[in-house]
């Protein structure tokens, strides 16, 4: 098989189809120019933007839309900073109106975040489920940030989430994938009756190997921000993340070999020049 034959199906979320499985945030960069260049290096097609009262903006007060090519990227408004379902619904509707004005196709979806704790930035499961149900009823394709709790993930899918996005670890922590077992359970449960249902790992990624691990577990994509924005060289890290998501995806599709306690020779044993005792014989010789 040639490398040209290693094709992959696109990632479908609601009405959107993406060939890149890396979704990238736009906050916390030193400069807007750095953000712009990092997005380009990442190869992403979808960028998340925080919604505020009057505009989509970054902490410097600059309008982020001046540095994002809305013809190139699908914008994904997010409700970052909301602590109640009501606030999240308001933010989502504001984002929808802004993107409709821009004519960007991202006006029909939203990344839902409803936080429950300002220190850990972990989500409030009750408010998240309530907001997801309301937004789905209002016609949004809802991508839900949640914890690694399989029960909450199931409830979000049941109330209409277009994608469930469990955290690898707390937002911005860089701690990586702390509970792979729970993520595997979430993947099993949510894909049981629909293997194409999108599960995207969101939050906690620290470096490229974390992205590969997430993809090797079977995730459909990874959403990240701080791991690029706070890297020593953000543009270089963005490029690393681009390669990592592809490497992890191909590894998942290819299938890893089983883990074994003992070694297994990769070279044929027939006709070897010398033999070496195994097991108890080796122990006797050693004594």
From Swiss-Prot:
The GO terms this record gives for MF are:
thiazole synthase activity
Q: Where is the protein situated, by its record's location annotation? A: Cytoplasm
Q: What does the record give as its pathway?
A: Cofactor biosynthesis; thiamine diphosphate biosynthesis
Gene Ontology biological process terms from the UniProt entry: thiamine biosynthetic process; thiamine diphosphate biosynthetic process
> What's the superkingdom here?
Bacteria
Query: A Gene Ontology CC term for this entry?
Result: cytoplasm
Extract the ranges annotated as region (Disordered): 268-287
Identify the enzyme class: transferase
Q: Could you say which EC number(s) this protein's record lists?
A: 2.8.1.10
- Entry-linked SUPFAM superfamilies: ThiG-like
Q: Which Gene3D superfamilies match?
A: Aldolase class I
Q: Which residues bind 1-deoxy-D-xylulose 5-phosphate?
A: 172, 203-204, 225-226
Q: Which reaction does it catalyse?
A: [ThiS sulfur-carrier protein]-C-terminal-Gly-aminoethanethioate + 2-iminoacetate + 1-deoxy-D-xylulose 5-phosphate = [ThiS sulfur-carrier protein]-C-terminal Gly-Gly + 2-[(2R,5Z)-2-carboxy-4-methylthiazol-5(2H)-ylidene]ethyl phosphate + 2 H2O + H(+)
Q: Which UniProt keywords apply?
A: Cytoplasm, Schiff base, Thiamine biosynthesis, Transferase
**Record-annotated active site:** 111
Similarity field:
Belongs to the ThiG family.
- What task does this protein carry out? Catalyzes the rearrangement of 1-deoxy-D-xylulose 5-phosphate (DXP) to produce the thiazole phosphate moiety of thiamine. Sulfur is provided by the thiocarboxylate moiety of the carrier protein ThiS. In vitro, sulfur can be provided by H(2)S.
Q: Quaternary structure per UniProt? A: Homotetramer. Forms heterodimers with either ThiH or ThiS.
Please report the name of this protein according to its UniProt entry. Thiazole synthase
Q: Which organism is it from?
A: Rhodopirellula baltica (strain DSM 10527 / NCIMB 13988 / SH1)
Taxonomic lineage of the native organism: Bacteria, Pseudomonadati, Planctomycetota, Planctomycetia, Pirellulales
Q: Which gene encodes it?
A: thiG
């Amino acid at each position: 098989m040639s490398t040209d034959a290693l094709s992959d199906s696109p990632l479908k979320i609601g009405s959107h189809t993406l060939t890149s499985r890396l979704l990238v945030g736009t906050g916390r960069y030193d400069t807007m120019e750095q953000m712009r260049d990092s997005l380009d290096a990442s190869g992403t097609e979808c960028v998340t933007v925080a919604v505020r009262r009057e505009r989509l903006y970054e902490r410097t007060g600059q309008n982020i839309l001046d540095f994002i090519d809305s013809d190139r990227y699908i914008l994904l408004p997010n409700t970052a900073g909301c602590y109640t379902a009501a606030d999240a619904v308001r933010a989502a509707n504001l984002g929808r109106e802004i993107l409709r004005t821009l004519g960007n196709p991202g006006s029909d979806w939203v990344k839902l975040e409803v936080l429950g704790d300002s220190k850990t930035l972990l989500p409030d499961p009750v408010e998240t489920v309530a907001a997801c149900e309301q937004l789905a009823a209002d016609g949004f394709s809802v991508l839900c940030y949640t914890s690694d709790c399989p029960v909450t993930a199931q409830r979000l899918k049941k109330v209409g989430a277009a994608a469930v996005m469990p955290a690898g670890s707390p937002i911005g922590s860089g701690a990586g994938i702390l509970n792979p077992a729970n993520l595997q359970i979430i993947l099993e449960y949510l894909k049981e009756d629909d293997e194409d249902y999108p599960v995207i790992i969101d939050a906690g990624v620290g470096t490229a190997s974390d992205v590969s691990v997430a993809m090797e577990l079977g995730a459909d994509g990874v959403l990240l921000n701080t791991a690029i924005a706070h890297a020593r060289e953000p543009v270089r890290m963005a490029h690393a993340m681009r390669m990592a998501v592809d490497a992890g995806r191909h590894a998942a599709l290819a299938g890893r070999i089983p883990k074994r306690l003992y070694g297994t020779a990769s070279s044929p044993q027939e006709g070897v020049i010398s033999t070496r005792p195994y097991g108890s014989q080796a122990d006797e010789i050693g004594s």
